[in-house]
Amino acid sequence: MISYTSLIGLVLASVMFFCVPKLSKLEKPPVKKEFFKSFKDILSNRQMNYLMLISMMKSLITNSSCILLPFLWKAMGHSPFYIGFALFLFVFAGAFSSFLSPKAEKLFGSKPVVYFSMLATFPMMVLFALTYKTHSVLSLVIFFLIGFTTMLAQPVTMVWAQRTLPEYKSIVAGFINGFCWGIVALCMSILGAVAQNCGIMKVLVLLSIVPAISSYFVKFLKEKKNESD
């Protein structure tokens, strides 16, 4: 039998099909660019390399925190509800900071936002390491702030990359949101093995140093205004 949720999904899909504006048949087809040429242009662009590095650092903290910490909390005897709530706070904080990111960029500029996002993660992770055993509520607040801080620069990085190579906007988005995160995901099995032998919290604190060190390359980034600005 079809469940109620499936019926709701079918209804919503039908509404989207009939209500979302269709692409005009008179619209000129987009100019197709050579696939390998676009990859070469992106990977050979130094500014794009720096931006992809920043995106990888964001993914490094996000993925390692969301994957490794549940095992730590489970070993400490925390309930599944506590673990799920902690992850919800982290993801919600990231979504909220992504929403505020454009406003922060207009107020402070692109570079200060990226600097803050990459440098502030390390001291917050140290505070989390000092409180997660004895002050569970306070550690959740700090974990929320880690999620907020880590993801604050993600939209800025995305827009910055698209402004760098506006002719490859969609492919650039794939690199920032897909390729960079995929590279980090491939490393997670190795990080998991290291964490099992050395300790999860030690690994997370050490990993949080990497974005702070990588923030050195932010100074080489050049500001690029949007065409509509």
What are these regions, as identified by a protein language model?
Residues M16-P30, K219-D229:
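Helix-loop junctions on the cytosolic side of multi-pass membrane transporters
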Residues V20-I54:
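Juxtamembrane intracellular "pre-TM" segments in multi-pass secondary transporters
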